[in-house]
């Protein structure tokens, strides 16, 4: 039985190219996995990659992850794709949006069977989501839209109901605004989680520190 179950949600949307943020994100993933393998081998750890969709990733896949290429440069994007339509595949969809809602949904599925009260999501991102699912429909909305924010907050509430805490590590980026920061606080605090501001270069240190703190609280 794991004492602690964690899903790490890694933002690999187009903006993570900025200042090589994606490199720091991958380094953090490897550092956290190494710590758990050495010190807490019974703990559960799963990685989920987020772009316009969310995909589970094995630790062996993390080093090869890359930010998705930006394929649309329009100042306003409002797209809807019916992913239940067999004529529509993932390859038809611009990949560089940020679907945190789908990432949290996958995280809940991984954490549901874990027999521990200590469940959490570590979300590493640089700002507001720009994609979400409503049933089979995928919405890609830029600039960030209230509809996507509300869908993501609903997913956060489901996490909270299932005893899952969301901690957010918010990376600085050129486009970050007060709205990005406020959203991170709303999402984290709705699950009794926290927001950490860290430069990318320090990310691995802070995430490992947070994990060790959490383990000490459990033991205490």
What is the predicted function of each stretch?
Residues 97-103:
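Structured catalytic core of nucleotide-sugar glycosyltransferases
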Residues 43-87, 132-136, 176-187, 207-208:
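Short beta-strand-loop
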Residues 19, 89-94:
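Second-shell loop/turn segments in exported
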Residues 10-13, 85-89:
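Glycine/charged-rich beta-loop-alpha catalytic/anionic-binding loops adjacent to active sites
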Residues 104-120, 128-131, 135-220:
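Von Willebrand factor type A / integrin I
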Residues 29, 100, 152:
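Aromatic/hydrophobic pocket-lining residues that form the small-molecule binding cavity
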Residues 21, 25, 96, 141-148:
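Residue-level preference for long, well-ordered alpha-helices that form the structural scaffold
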Residues 1-76, 103-107, 117-124, 167-171:
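Von Willebrand factor
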């Amino acid at each position: 039985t794991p004492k602690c179950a964690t899903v790490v949600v890694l933002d690999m949307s187009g903006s993570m190219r900025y200042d090589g943020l994606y490199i720091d994100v991958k380094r953090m993933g490897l550092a956290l996995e190494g710590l758990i393998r050495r010190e807490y081998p019974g703990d559960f750890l799963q990685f989920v990659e987020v772009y316009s969709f969310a995909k589970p990733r094995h630790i062996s896949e993390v080093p090869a992850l890359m930010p998705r290429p930006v394929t649309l440069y329009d100042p306003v994007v409002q797209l809807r794709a019916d992913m239940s339509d067999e004529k529509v595949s993932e390859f038809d969809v611009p990949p560089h949006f940020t679907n945190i809602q789908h990432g949290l949904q996958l995280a809940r599925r991984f954490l549901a069977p874990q027999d521990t009260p200590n469940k959490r999501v570590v979300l590493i991102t640089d700002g507001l989501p720009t994609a979400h699912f409503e049933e089979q429909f995928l919405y890609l909305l830029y600039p960030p839209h209230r509809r996507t924010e509300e869908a993501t907050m609903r997913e956060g509430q489901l996490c909270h109901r299932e005893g899952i805490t969301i901690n957010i590590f918010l990376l600085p980026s050129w486009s970050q605004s007060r709205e990005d920061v406020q959203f991170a606080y709303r999402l984290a605090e709705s699950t009794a989680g926290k927001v950490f501001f860290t430069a990318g270069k320090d990310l691995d240190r802070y995430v490992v520190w947070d994990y060790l703190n959490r383990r000490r609280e459990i033991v205490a």
